[in-house]
Amino acid sequence: MIEFRQVSKTFNKKKQKIDALKDVSFTVNRNDIFGVIGYSGAGKSTLVRLVNHLEAASNGQVIVDGHDITNYSDKMMRDIKKDIGMIFQHFNLLNSATVFKNVAMPLILSKKSKTEIKQRVTEMLEFVGLSDKKDQFPEELSGGQKQRVAIARALVTNPKILLCDEATSALDPATTASILTLLKNVNQTFGITIMMITHEMRVIKDICNRVAVMEKGQVVETGTVKEVFSHPKTTIAQNFVSTVIQTEPSTSLIRRLNDEQVGDFKDYKIFVEETQVTQPIINDLIQICGREVKILFSSMSEIQGNTVCYMWLRFNMDQQFDDTAINQYFKEKNIQFEEVH
C-alpha cells in the first residue's frame, strides 16, 4: 500500500545540508495499522510528508497504492490525494466554522452536492460519536472531541489511507485510549490503512500491528509489534519498550542479588507468550535440571490483546550442571530465551 525504497531527503538550510532521511526502506501493507516511532528529529514527520507529497524525496522511490509518486507534479497528485486522509497533533480545525462545516469542508472544496454533503457528514459524525455537536464550534469542544472532528473530516472523502502525525500527543491518557479505540474501529470497519507517527510506545503497543523504529533519519528496526516488544534488537527500541513494559529487573537489584549469591550461577531471560503463560514452566525446569530455579524477576503485560510474560531465572551451577536440556526445553516449547552473562 505504501512503500519506501531507499528513500533519502536532504534539506538545504543556510548553505548547510541536513539529511532528514537516509536510505529508508520499508513497506506498509494494505489494512495495516503501521507505527513509526522515534524521538524528536528522527525524521518521522518528514517521512509522512512524502506520502502526501508535501515534500519530495531527494533520492529513492515512494510508492503509494501502486503509484510511484516520487516525481509526480501537484496536478498528477490530485487523484492520489483524494485517497489519503490526515490528522494532526493540533487538530487544524477552522475555529470560525461549526463542527458540521469543518467535517464538510473537503466535500465543499470538491463541489459535491448539498444532499451528498449532508448525508456523508451526518454518517461520519455519527461514526465518531459527535452527532449532537454538529452545530457547535471548536472552542466549545474538548481536545478529544476536536480530534474526533478531525478524524471525521479525514474520513468524509472515503480515503484508502489515513496518516496520523502525533495525533494523540496533545491528549490525556484516557482520551488517548478512546481515540486509539476509534482509530482501530476505523481500520476494522472501513479497511483503511493507517500509518501512525508517534514518539509514544504505548500508542504502538495498543493499536499497531507492525512498527518501524527511527533514529537520526534512519530506520534502525522493523517488525511486528510482538517481535519488537519480545526481543528489541537496538538500544533505542529497548529504551522505547522499557517506557511501557518492564522487561527485566533493575541494575541495582541484579547487583544486590549477585552480591548475595553463593557459588556459580547461570541466568536466563525468557519471553513467554499467551499460549504458554499457564504452562508449568518452572516446575518442568526443576524436574529437568534437578535443582531449584530462582525467579529473580517476572512481569506480565498485554500486547495486541495477548498476555505475555517476561521472566529472569537463575540456576545454581556445579560440576553436574548441564544446560543442554534446559536450552532444548525452551526450544521445544517455542519460548524465546537469552543466556545472561
Curated annotation (Swiss-Prot):
Q: Name one GO cellular component term.
A: plasma membrane
Q: Does the keyword Metal-binding apply?
A: no
Per its record, how is this protein called by name? Methionine import ATP-binding protein MetN 1
Is ATP-binding among this UniProt entry's keywords? yes
Q: Which reaction does it catalyse?
A: L-methionine(out) + ATP + H2O = L-methionine(in) + ADP + phosphate + H(+); D-methionine(out) + ATP + H2O = D-methionine(in) + ADP + phosphate + H(+)
Family to which the UniProt record says this protein belongs: Belongs to the ABC transporter superfamily. Methionine importer (TC 3.A.1.24) family.
The entry's localization annotation reads: Cell membrane
- What does the UniProt function comment say about this protein? Part of the ABC transporter complex MetNIQ involved in methionine import. Responsible for energy coupling to the transport system.
Give the record's membrane topology. Answer: Peripheral membrane protein
Which InterPro entries is this protein grouped with?
AAA+_ATPase (IPR003593), ABC_transporter-like_ATP-bd (IPR003439), ABC_transporter-like_CS (IPR017871), ACT-like_dom_sf (IPR045865), MetN_ABC (IPR041701), MetN_ABC_transporter-like (IPR050086), NIL_domain (IPR018449), P-loop_NTPase (IPR027417)
Question: What are the recorded GO MF terms, alphabetically?
Answer: ABC-type D-methionine transporter activity; ATP binding; ATP hydrolysis activity
Listed SMART domains: AAA (SM00382), NIL (SM00930)
Q: Which CDD domains match?
A: ABC_MetN_methionine_transporter (cd03258)
Q: What is its main location?
A: membrane
Recorded E.C. number(s)?
Answer: 7.4.2.11
Sorted alphabetically, the keyword list is: Amino-acid transport, ATP-binding, Cell membrane, Membrane, Nucleotide-binding, Translocase, Transport
Quote any Pfam family the record assigns. NIL
Give the residues the record marks as binding ATP.
Answer: 38-45
Q: Could you tell me which species this protein originates from?
A: Staphylococcus aureus (strain MSSA476)
Q: Where is the ABC transporter domain?
A: 2-241
How does it associate, per the subunit comment?
A: The complex is composed of two ATP-binding proteins (MetN), two transmembrane proteins (MetI) and a solute-binding protein (MetQ).
